[in-house]
UniProtKB/Swiss-Prot annotation:
Enzyme Commission code(s) on record: 2.7.7.60
Protein name: 2-C-methyl-D-erythritol 4-phosphate cytidylyltransferase
Name of encoding gene: ispD
Catalytic activity: 2-C-methyl-D-erythritol 4-phosphate + CTP + H(+) = 4-CDP-2-C-methyl-D-erythritol + diphosphate
Species for this entry: Chlamydia trachomatis serovar L2 (strain ATCC VR-902B / DSM 19102 / 434/Bu)
UniProt enzyme class: transferase
Gene Ontology MF annotations: 2-C-methyl-D-erythritol 4-phosphate cytidylyltransferase activity
UniProt KW keywords: Isoprene biosynthesis, Nucleotidyltransferase, Transferase
Amino acid sequence: MNLSCSLVLLGGGKGERFNSLQPKQYTHLCGEPLILHALHAYQRLPFVQEVVVVCEEQYRELFLPYSVKFASPGTLRQDSVFSGLQQVFTPWVCIHDGVRPFVYADEVIEVCSAARKTGAAALASPATYTIKSCAPVRTLDRDALAVIHTPQCLDTEVLREGLLLARAMDFSLSDDTEAAELLGIEPTLVFSNRVQIKVTYPEDLLFAETLLSKSSTYK
């Protein structure tokens, strides 16, 4: 199966919950910015044809040693994705958060393969916590729920149309595959059996450092 795709790497978030002077995606993990851990992993994948980094202009110097394109971030995540999408010229696109430094080749391959069948796919984990809705307060069936991560892979035109529809509806998307859902497409979920780290708080960085220092399989 031809898995050729572009990567849109999101590096425009401000990370206000991280309590740092710089955005968390540029905080160092074992000597290297978080976002570069993700970039290096994707650059090792031969089917990734091009990389678009969505970031503020002041951080672009960090990526100059690499063969990447740039796009400017927007107000919302979906605006940043749409901005990156303007630089994409392949039929398929993979979206990844710059604050998710752990990228596993087999999971990217599985997500991209699954997307070819339905038009959209996302990496996921089973919900393991008890989750309640707030209004009214009631317990949800966690067996029917999943936690969504990146990578997420979509047909480029499906994502573009879904993002435009969301904008026309003034609708805030929770993730990228929700753009496909707006078009009536049911995304495929690819379940991971690994710990999926999104660095949101300082404690997440400590956990990531511990995991990385003890792992020989991170690739």
